[in-house]
Amino acid sequence: MPRKGHIAKRDVLPDPLYNSKVVTKLINSIMLDGKRGVAQKICYDAFEIIGEKSGKDAMEVFETAMNNIMPLLEVKARRIGGATYQVPIEVRPERRQTLGIRWMLIAARKRGERSMRERLAGELLDASNNTGAAVKKREDTHKMAEANKAFAHYRY
C-alpha cells in the first residue's frame, strides 16, 4: 500500500480508426512483446472480416459481443472460521470490460482457424450471436455465482 495516498489511474487514448477506448484496450491485450503495429493490424483486419461476413457495422457487432461476454457476477474465495466459501459479488464496470476482453482473447486463441485475425473475427461473431467459448465462460461464472447465492451475506 502506498504511503503517499492514492495513485492516479492512467487513462488509455482512443484508437485512431474507431475512436474507441475499448478497442485500444483490446489492441493492448492482443499485443505481444510490445508489437503494437502487429496487434493493430490483427484487430482492424478482424473487424474488416466481421464487416464482410455479417454485413453489419463491425463496431456494432463488437459492442454486442462485448455485452454478451462481460460478466455481471463472479465468485470470490472468502475464508471464514477454517472454511473457504465461494462468495458471489458484483463485478465493477472496469473489471467487467477487462474480463470480457481477456476471455474473448483466450477463446479466440484456442480456436482452429489459421490466423489470429480469423479467430478473433470468428469469436466476436459467435459472441454477438450469444454462442462461443467466451459466452460459455460467462455463463459458467454466472452459474457458479447462482449456486453459491447462499453465501452472499458474507460479501465484503
From Swiss-Prot:
GO terms for molecular function: rRNA binding; structural constituent of ribosome; tRNA binding. Keywords: Ribonucleoprotein, Ribosomal protein, RNA-binding, rRNA-binding, tRNA-binding. CDD domains: uS7_Bacteria. The keyword Ribonucleoprotein applies. SUPFAM superfamilies: Ribosomal protein S7 (SSF47973). GO terms for cellular component: small ribosomal subunit. It holds the Pfam family Ribosomal_S7. GO terms for biological process: translation. InterPro entries: Ribosomal_uS7, Ribosomal_uS7_bac/org-type, Ribosomal_uS7_CS, Ribosomal_uS7_dom, Ribosomal_uS7_dom_sf. It comes from the Bacteria. One of the primary rRNA binding proteins, it binds directly to 16S rRNA where it nucleates assembly of the head domain of the 30S subunit. Is located at the subunit interface close to the decoding center, probably blocks exit of the E-site tRNA. Belongs to the universal ribosomal protein uS7 family. Part of the 30S ribosomal subunit. Contacts proteins S9 and S11. This is Small ribosomal subunit protein uS7. It comes from Clostridium botulinum (strain Okra / Type B1).
